[in-house]
Amino acid sequence: MNEEIKQKFCREFGTDRVLLEEPMKRHTTFRIGGPAEVFVMPENLEEVQRILEICRTEDLPYFILGNGSNLLVSDRGYRGVVIQMDRNFGEVKVEGTEIHASAGALLSTIAVAARRASLTGFEFAGGIPGTLGGAVVMNAGAYGGEMKDVLRKVMVMDQSGKVFEIPAEELQMGYRTSIIKTAGYIVLGAVLSLKEGNLEEIKMLTRKLSEQRTSKQPLEYPSAGSTFKRPEGYFAGKLIMDSGLRGYRVGGAQVSEKHCGFVINTGDATAEDVCGLMKHVTETVYAKFGVTLEPEVKFLGEF
């Protein structure tokens, strides 16, 4: 990307909301990643449309960033435009048994709003460290619940900037996938359909799931969450543990001793370390069990 295009972004959106060569390790839960050429923080829908228009005109790749969870950015960074949709797109509103939320709303924030309104059905997502947008795209789930269980409709933007709604029955949601992911749509917001519940029971379930997460997951280290998808009929973490890889390290990346389904950053891990570790894990598990592990983490940049 030439300097003139970079300055165009700065002029249009302001130097306080356009960062050049911004280290992506500042914006991912893995705390790993080289610089993004242009990092933009739009304030509203119209600005997102304008950014996409510039990207189309100048033939620039772009990436929509929420909370930076479930993401591994290359050490060489990203040669394109990162569009961060978090705090400026974080509205959460309760209407009866429905919650209307914008794409940048944290799942934990939505879970708190649901609990305060005595609405049940979203407890599973309260501890997932991500935003609504990313969770909808990949049909995020935990503890027996998935986003598809609670979605009524989703507002999206296509790559041309057109905005429209997709009802839940047309989202084609499966295990860590959706039509939004396959079509490359941008999530702007969603309506969640929950049920009236008992406040004390909701609090008890929330506390129980939180305790499970804290006791079983390596929350004290940076990570991208679950590193591999769950193979049909198996658990990735158990396959990795039974392959003798608990605590296995490559550089600063390590298979968590607390939960083998997590690769953690022990302090100075690089994307190269993580990729090397994932490759070794995948090859070892396949050699021992004949099961191919697929990454759940998304890769951004050149690897």
List each language-model region with its residue ranges:
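Anion-binding (especially nucleotide phosphate/pyrophosphate-binding) glycine-rich loop
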Residues: 2-132
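Conserved active-site and cofactor/substrate-binding residues in soluble primary-metabolism enzymes
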Residues: 4, 25, 43-46, 105, ...
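Phosphate/pyrophosphate- and phosphate-bearing ligand-binding catalytic cores of soluble enzymes
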Residues: 19-20, 157-284, 288-303
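Conserved beta-strand segments that form the floor/walls of ligand-binding pockets within enzyme
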Residues: 31, 84, 100-102, 123, ...
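Structural signature of FAD isoalloxazine-binding scaffolds in flavoprotein oxidoreductases
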Residues: 33-34, 39-45, 72-90, 137-168, ...
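Gly/Ser/Thr-rich beta-alpha loop segments that engage phosphate groups in nucleotides
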Residues: 35, 68-72, 79, 106, ...
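Short, basic and Ser/Thr-rich N-terminal targeting/leader segments
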Residues: 58, 65-67, 150, 221-222, ...
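A generic local secondary-structure boundary/capping motif
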Residues: 70-71, 111-114, 122-126, 139-146, ...
